[in-house]
Amino acid sequence: MALPRCTWPNYVWRAVMACLVHRGLGAPLTLCMLGCLLQAGHVLSQKLDDVDPLVATNFGKIRGIKKELNNEILGPVIQFLGVPYAAPPTGERRFQPPEPPSPWSDIRNATQFAPVCPQNIIDGRLPEVMLPVWFTNNLDVVSSYVQDQSEDCLYLNIYVPTEDVKRISKECARKPGKKICRKGGPLTKKQTDDLGDNDGAEDEDIRDSGGPKPVMVYIHGGSYMEGTGNLYDGSVLASYGNVIVITVNYRLGVLGFLSTGDQAAKGNYGLLDLIQALRWTSENIGFFGGDPLRITVFGSGAGGSCVNLLTLSHYSEGNRWSNSTKGLFQRAIAQSGTALSSWAVSFQPAKYARMLATKVGCNVSDTVELVECLQKKPYKELVDQDIQPARYHIAFGPVIDGDVIPDDPQILMEQGEFLNYDIMLGVNQGEGLKFVENIVDSDDGISASDFDFAVSNFVDNLYGYPEGKDVLRETIKFMYTDWADRHNPETRRKTLLALFTDHQWVAPAVATADLHSNFGSPTYFYAFYHHCQTDQVPAWADAAHGDEVPYVLGIPMIGPTELFPCNFSKNDVMLSAVVMTYWTNFAKTGDPNQPVPQDTKFIHTKPNRFEEVAWTRYSQKDQLYLHIGLKPRVKEHYRANKVNLWLELVPHLHNLNDISQYTSTTTKVPSTDITFRPTRKNSVPVTSAFPTAKQDDPKQQPSPFSVDQRDYSTELSVTIAVGASLLFLNILAFAALYYKKDKRRHDVHRRCSPQRTTTNDLTHAQEEEIMSLQMKHTDLDHECESIHPHEVVLRTACPPDYTLAMRRSPDDVPLMTPNTITMIPNTIPGIQPLHTFNTFTGGQNNTLPHPHPHPHSHSTTRV
């Protein structure tokens, strides 16, 4: 018997069919259908009451609060704050996946924020280095949001718009006297005429007129260590974009990501919290007027990397309202963070778990007993411990557990695990501001010695290896030296900022976009070039890490707030409206250009430049991206030279180092107990000309480009590698020809053919080793395998997976038990192939200590 088709959304009919299947057809069909239709139709029957907003969810009724916004163009928003999406992860539930919340019978007031998840607070204030730039001079206000801490913290906040701003604006432009138009109205007479003349349907948001609204779930950043969704008010974005916005609290730090590397504590509880929040959203958002088939996750910094990781997890599949091709969400926006950065994944979880256990008196060999001991400790004792990770890495964060994250993120991306999601991602122009601020003592720029030290320390921590480190160090210095203005301290500061930005953010984002677009999946890339003018950040700073967040949330449209104390201009308001339109369009259709066009006539009488720009999809070939700033334009190949330095050249230099070990003088590795930093103010800068002092003058520091150091130059290494390879190929060819000729005359005259090698022929063995590093198997998967002479082609090096080396922790082999389930990359033993952004195999070989250590105890990267 076919069911009559009504005009209800598809997901309601899916709910009806699912109910029929679940209950079976044994009961009278009429009663079964009636019960199912009533259950599914209840989703549509609930219209929010502005006076008493009450919603009945699957777990009980909740009451929200209506909030007016400080802008005439923005309609009121109904807020539901502190809504539980999981049971409290306390007691035995600590270090366990979340469970659904218990239902409640009374009406629950959702008018106040719930407690935030436990996090480390130093003297009542969050560590400055971990926060976005606009928070650094307002820490007292920020810290007030995280004072109320509890392990019972798994709550979310829902912001529901009450009016369609775009529809109201057009209606008021046509008929200003209508009751729906508030006194004074948002539009001038000229603007009214402009909008009245444009009567086309292209300005109408057809898909959202009266139907379920798209949903945007925001994941906050904070290096997986601090922060809360309570900090981010989604009201303006919800009202202006006509979408439902949700912010989430999830477990952080030790409580959210501790892993013993086995079944005792698998880790990734914070990610599982986010998955549970998405599951709750998928099953309940219909009661708030939301569309469970149009859920977009977005986040900045570590929140962006969480977004990326969620697209790679099979736990994100299984939306009850959809078919098998739809998951808990359908689209993703990763702002200034992907799963390929050095700080995105912890590859040493068991080591840090042991360190924590030792500090709190739980240092037992059995991991089950260790976890039981940690479960009995007060949470404050755990989160306050000083666990120092390697620089540019994290101690407690997502791990490759073979389950939530089944493999290295780059491998999962190559396998197309995220191809079913539409993805938008991007970076800010000057993400690495905080790293540079820790080096700069004044506004005068960076001295040559500080520049040399910063680069050396960077290489030591991320690419340190015993031999040939100088090659990589000097190459990076060379590439990030502005040779037209190399003596200018301000120029050095600018290039150093670019170095940190390119390595930690830009190159991982481009690599992620390349991998996603390779499958033909919709990919959009942006570069954010604007920040508000304020005295709280240096005048020389570009758009820093997190500077896009207030524009995404629409803060400029309501003026300065205590969290965003900036004097926003009309340009800021216009740009925020543009960004919100792009973001919400993407949430609605997967295309940031549709369905709502760029129109900010309520701010400026003249059209903005974004009206003439079409944001083109990204592809690996063209690498088109949108320059978001006051002068927008679509450009191609963002920072291509520097990106390919990290993705292509650096891995080759790492492999060439293995070759140079056979051909250059071996330098003894400095003792791990000896660390130093150059202290002389008049040391010769790396960009200066050749020194005129005698080389035997101990007071004169030789230039890194001196003749006696040319053994370490890239050119010489390449020359030696290619020359040795060609020589050996010639030897092989000559030997094969001679052997063939000799074999013909074998019956007549036996002659001894030259031997390829002997057991004690060290020189020739070295040549064979060199050759093995220069040949490439002609297989499509580009992996270094066994090489046969008839299958080889000459090349400079065998490039490893360029992202696998990017995140490798610089410490020694992780502490893993025999029943380990955490999947450490299989290239750790022996010579490690280079991950583009992190390959150091021995963290204790750092030759230079950082002069400005980070104050936070768990993470050294502000994301």
Swiss-Prot record:
* Family annotation (SUPFAM superfamilies): alpha/beta-Hydrolases
Renumbered to this chain, the Polar residues biased-composition regions fall at 681-690
Q: What UniProt keywords are attached to this protein's entry?
A: Autism, Autism spectrum disorder, Biological rhythms, Cell adhesion, Cell membrane, Disease variant, Disulfide bond, Glycoprotein, Membrane, Secreted, Signal, Synapse, Transmembrane, Transmembrane helix
Query: Under which name does UniProt file this protein?
Result: Neuroligin-1
* Source organism per UniProt: Homo sapiens (Human)
Which ranges sit in the Cytoplasmic compartment?
A: 739-863
According to the entry, the disease involved is: Autism 20: A complex multifactorial, pervasive developmental disorder characterized by impairments in reciprocal social interaction and communication, restricted and stereotyped patterns of interests and activities, and the presence of developmental abnormalities by 3 years of age. Most individuals with autism also manifest moderate intellectual disability. The transmission pattern of AUTS20 is consistent with autosomal dominant inheritance.
Q: Enumerate composition-biased segments (Basic residues).
A: 851-863
Give the result of residue 309 to P, as annotated: In AUTS20; risk factor for disease development; decreased function in dendritic spine formation; decreased protein abundance; does not localize to the plasma membrane but is retained in the endoplasmic reticulum
Tell me yes or no: is Transmembrane helix among this UniProt entry's keywords.
Answer: yes
- What effect on the protein does mutating residue 89 to L have, as reported in its record? In AUTS20; risk factor for disease development; decreased function in dendritic spine formation; decreased protein abundance; does not localize to the plasma membrane but is retained in the endoplasmic reticulum
This protein's assembly is summarised as:
Interacts with neurexins NRXN1, NRXN2 and NRXN3. Interaction with neurexins is mediated by heparan sulfate glycan modification on neurexin. Interacts with NLGN3. Interacts with AIP1 and PDZRN3. Interacts (via its C-terminus) with DLG4/PSD-95 (via PDZ domain 3). Interacts with GOPC.
Q: What is the lineage of its organism?
A: Eukaryota, Metazoa, Chordata, Craniata, Vertebrata
